[in-house]
Amino acid sequence: MTTTIAIASGKGGVGKTTISVNLSLSLALQNKETLLLDADLGMANSHILLGINPKFTLDDFVTGKSSIDDVITITKDKLKFISGGSAINNLLNLSNLERHKIIQSFNNIKKRPEYMLIDVGAGAEASSMTFMASSDKIIIVLTGEPTSFIDAYSLIKAAFLDYKINVP
């Protein structure tokens, strides 16, 4: 069974992607079958930190050009990676149905990973909340700045009160 962990933040620039990439690589280097999904849809940049340029992105899956297995890139460190794509307008405006299709597709991956980490877009957007709600655990990343604390609190409050997300 796959353990899904969403890594989220109330605001950008707090190190969420760095933590997502490093935690994913750490698990992969411990021979744990690990998949990192960059779900900062349309504005993804985990691939830059990984030093790779994926041939396919989540957009190829959403538009039906590729299967979910085809959009997985395997890094030299044996980390499986799915890019959310950069500057792809289709991914910025996904419907609820399309987001749920993405989440459901992970049940169809040929070799299911032990861990799936989701680098969620910053803030309380519907897309971020959908990925957080589908996770077993959520990590909220923040810095010592007052705005980071306030935005993290707002994200947690919105997740719990507005989206009924009650995940440890």
Residue locations for each model-derived region?
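Short, ordered loop/turn segments at secondary-structure junctions
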Residues: G12, A39-L41, D77, S86-A87, ...
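P-loop/Walker-type NTP enzyme "switch/lid" segment
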Residues: L37-K111
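Alpha-helical segments flanking ligand/cofactor-binding loops in enzyme cores
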Residues: L25, N107, M129-T130
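Walker A/P-loop phosphate-binding motif and the immediately C-terminal alpha-helix
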Residues: T2-D40
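Loop/turn-to-beta-strand initiation segments
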Residues: E33, K78-K80, K111-L117, K137
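Conserved catalytic-core segment of NTP-binding enzymes
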Residues: Y115, V120-P168
